[in-house]
Design a protein with these regions (language model features):
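Membrane-water interface segments that mark the loop-to-transmembrane alpha-helix transition
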Residues: 58-102, 290-310
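Residue-level signature of transmembrane alpha-helical cores of multipass secondary-active transporters
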Residues: 12-16, 50, 86, 120-121, ...
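Membrane-interface helix-loop junctions in multi-pass transport and translocation proteins
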Residues: 141-146, 156-194, 359-362, 372-405, ...
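Membrane-interface junctions at transmembrane-helix termini in multi-pass inner-membrane proteins
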Residues: 127-150, 340-369
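Interhelical loop/hinge segments that connect adjacent transmembrane helices in multipass membrane
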Residues: 1-2, 174-182, 197-231, 413-419
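Signature of the first transmembrane helix
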Residues: 4-62, 94, 98, 124, ...
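Helix-loop junctions and terminal segments of transmembrane helices
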Residues: 57-72, 266-290
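Short membrane-interface helical motifs at transmembrane helix boundaries
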Residues: 92-112, 169, 309-328, 332
């Protein structure tokens, strides 16, 4: 068990590190090419992108990995059934987004420039869903190499676009540039998906449909969908509420700085936690608590040390990191505040995997529901007292701490000894 976990963790850790670094480089290049106004527009539509991806995937990827890892059903029949189902579902969703794009940009985001980016998002989501399903299949069977390499290929293609091709479009309007950035995801997703298909034996590429498999997957996926949807919907509402309740004329710029500069840097270390969580899922799904408690305690201890280290780095060298990465100091004061609660943020994926592995997907839903309520309600309260962008920052801190306490309560309820 430990050997498999170490091997899987190592592959995901290295792949996650390279992917995060490539992603950071891509963000640097894009932000320098499109400027602060372009970045603000891009970050304004990003929550919509996240919400639609969540809806398009319907909570299936995690459920597929869980069932493939823990059941004796034929894995290829599981994923092919889901490909057919989600293929039809995503085509319907694409047309619905195209029809409602004008309403989303005008009435929700209050910015007509968001129209073209939303159109771009509609065409990207089916390709994102396709690659996500195939990656989840490989994670479920414990073969981490194909998804790791496909992620690297996807980000390398995006890097080539950002570095070599994006410069040809800088004379266009901000709306068109953001549309092009979003629509290029189709190319990167398609190439990475074709690479994944190489690792699937030809005899297993035949598409079949099994209705009983679909029902079983959806029973596990629906709680995941509700959980992910609530989280993404909360993220989607944040800029809408900020624009609605804030009296500052620069709130969209401040939001772009926070979500475009600070959050990516704060979340950069999560490659370590996400890699560990993904590697844990197949192992926890096939083990009992007695065999895994010791391993889980060790992992939490490592994440604690890791979080303390990142906090000190952000506090002492955050301004230098921002200058080195983005060539400006925008958001340093935000970063210093947010880094103080990094442990409570970084530990959450581990808890979610624990809940999934013991079949308590409802706990993930409860956690997301509590988290979203705390985040939105506290943000609204702070906005009413004119805290402006700090409303989002303070609500973020309160949210991650309260969510951590609630997750500990749920874990103790299941007699899992982590501390």
């Amino acid at each position: 068990m430990k050997k498999k976990f170490i091997t899987s963790s190592f592959l995901l850790l290295i792949g996650g590190l390279i992917t995060k670094l490539l992603g950071m480089i891509i963000k640097i290049i894009i932000s320098s090419r499109i400027g602060i106004n372009g970045l603000a527009l891009y970050m304004l539509v990003l929550p919509t992108f996240s919400l639609l991806i969540t809806v398009s995937q319907a909570g299936v990827p995690l459920a597929l990995s869980k069932l493939v890892a823990s059941s004796n059903k034929r894995p290829h029949e599981l994923y092919s059934t889901l490909l057919l189902f989600l293929g039809v579902y995503n085509i319907i969703l694409l047309f619905l987004v195209l029809i409602s794009a004008n309403f989303i940009s005008t009435n929700l985001l209050h910015n007509n420039s968001c129209y073209l980016p939303v159109i771009g998002i509609a065409f990207v989501i089916p390709f994102t869903t396709l690659s996500s399903i195939i990656r989840s299949y490989f994670i479920g069977i414990g073969n981490m190499l194909p998804p790791v390499i496909s992620n690297l290929i996807e980000n390398f293609i995006r890097f080539i676009f950002a570095y070599y091709l994006l410069g040809f479009f800088t004379d266009y309007s901000t709306s068109i540039i953001v549309f092009i950035i979003i629509i290029f995801n189709i190319v990167s997703e398609l190439i990475s998906t074709l690479f994944l298909l190489i690792f699937i034996p030809k005899r297993k590429r035949r598409i079949t449909f099994n209705n009983s498999y679909l029902k079983e997957v959806m029973c596990l996926a629906i709680p995941n969908l509700f959980s992910s949807f609530i989280g993404s919907f909360t993220y989607f509402l944040e800029p809408i509420i900020l624009l609605l309740l804030s009296s500052s004329n620069n709130i969209s710029i401040d939001y772009g700085i926070l979500t475009g500069y600070v959050y990516p840097l704060l979340l950069l270390p999560t490659f370590f936690v996400n890699a560990t969580a993904q590697a844990l899922l197949p192992i926890l799904s096939n083990s009992n608590n007695k065999n895994t408690n010791k391993l889980l305690r060790f992992i939490i201890f490592i994440i604690l040390l890791f979080s303390i280290g990142t906090t000190f780095v952000f506090l002492l060298f955050g301004d230098k990191l921002l200058l080195f990465i983005y060539h400006n100091y925008f958001g340093f004061k935000y970063l210093r505040i947010l880094s103080l609660f990094s442990f409570f943020l970084y530990i959450q994926p581990i808890f979610s995997i624990i809940f999934l592995s013991i079949g308590k997907t409802k706990y993930i839903f409860y956690t997301t529901l509590v988290s979203s309520f705390i985040r939105l309600s506290t943000m609204i309260i702070f906005l009413l007292f004119d805290f402006e962008i700090y409303s989002l920052i303070y609500s973020f801190l309160i949210n991650v701490f309260c969510t951590f306490i609630y997750q500990i309560y749920l874990i103790k309820k299941e007699d899992i000894l982590l501390f």
